[in-house]
């Protein structure tokens, strides 16, 4: 008897693992963990997250734009990053109110649960302050998805700032998406935290400076004040332990060259100094992977940016 029960349980787990179909009401709805509704502004590229249910692997995210007379489905996504999160790589630039919900599905995208409770967020424009950046500004880590408050430095910046960052971006990619992603929000001040991916992958300091100068020129042409942040350092030992790509070239020289240029611009925040150890590397106690500052590091960045904005743009904070 016990053997039959064991084999039946093993078969049930196997069916779920390989996407087999079971009753749509087999699982309870997922509990959502992203916290967009508690942020000053919804991120341009939201990362939806939820608490994964045992014996499940696949999830569907649906995003709906709330209409005056009729709601409209604007996203139907299926997770490919992990069991508990999914980043939306299509930017939310259209103002309005939205809600999102999640349900369990099988490999064939057939529902295995009801929809979760709805969570709402609002897209507004124009904004006074915004940040253009990469994963350090987008938020998130291996252990905490980007949509949670504790994994974004913007949470610790007590000046409300719109998050226009996108994980993985180089300065060229930010330049390429500037018109589509920045201009709809018409920020008065744009914080630019960019360049770490460039130097990590071997770009020269001059190449990064060229792109930053182009970003500056785009800002000025659109009556936006650019505020550059110094490029944070990296910890090569931790980076290699985590299997993250890192150039064999002299990334420190490139980073220092770019930071010297940044510190000669009219408006800049030195967020890197406090995060750097005596050897010039990102402090090991502030990073889980050698590239991304963890909670304490994000608190430092958020505090420094807020102090700078309040000191230099007091009439706008």
Locate predicted features.
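Signal that preferentially marks extracellular ectodomain short beta-strand elements
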Residues: 82-95
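Solvent-exposed loop/turn segments flanking beta-strands in beta-repeat/beta-sandwich domains
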Residues: 53-70
């Amino acid at each position: 008897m016990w053997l039959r029960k064991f084999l039946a349980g093993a078969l049930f787990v196997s069916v779920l693992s390989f996407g087999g179909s079971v009753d749509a009401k087999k699982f309870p709805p997922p509990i959502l963990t992203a916290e967009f509704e508690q942020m000053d502004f919804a991120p341009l590229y939201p990362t939806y997250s939820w608490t994964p249910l045992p014996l499940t692997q696949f999830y569907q995210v649906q995003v709906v734009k709330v209409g005056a007379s009729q709601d409209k489905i604007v996203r139907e996504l299926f997770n490919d990053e992990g069991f508990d999160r999914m980043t939306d790589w299509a930017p939310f630039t259209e103002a309005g109110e939205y809600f999102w919900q999640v349900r369990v599905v099988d490999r064939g995208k057939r529902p295995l649960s009801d929809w979760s409770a709805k969570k709402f967020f609002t897209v507004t424009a124009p904004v006074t302050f915004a940040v253009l950046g990469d994963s350090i500004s987008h938020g998130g880590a291996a252990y905490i998805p980007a949509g949670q408050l504790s994994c974004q430095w913007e949470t610790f910046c007590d000046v409300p700032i719109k998050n226009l960052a996108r994980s993985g971006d180089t300065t060229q990619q930010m330049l390429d998406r500037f018109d589509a992603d920045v201009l709809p929000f018409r920020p008065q001040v744009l914080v630019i935290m960019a360049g770490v991916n460039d130097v990590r992958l071997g770009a020269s300091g001059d190449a990064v400076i060229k792109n930053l100068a182009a970003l500056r020129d785009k800002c000025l042409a659109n009556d936006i004040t650019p505020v550059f942040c110094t490029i944070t350092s990296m910890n090569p030992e931790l980076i290699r332990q985590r299997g993250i790509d890192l150039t064999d070239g002299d990334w420190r020289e490139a980073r220092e060259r770019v930071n010297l240029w940044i510190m000669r611009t009219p408006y800049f925040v030195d967020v890197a100094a406090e995060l750097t150890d005596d050897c010039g590397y990102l402090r090991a106690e502030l990073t889980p992977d050698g590239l991304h500052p963890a909670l304490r590091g994000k608190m430092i960045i958020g505090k420094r940016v807020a102090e700078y904005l309040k000191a230099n743009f007091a009439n706008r904070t």
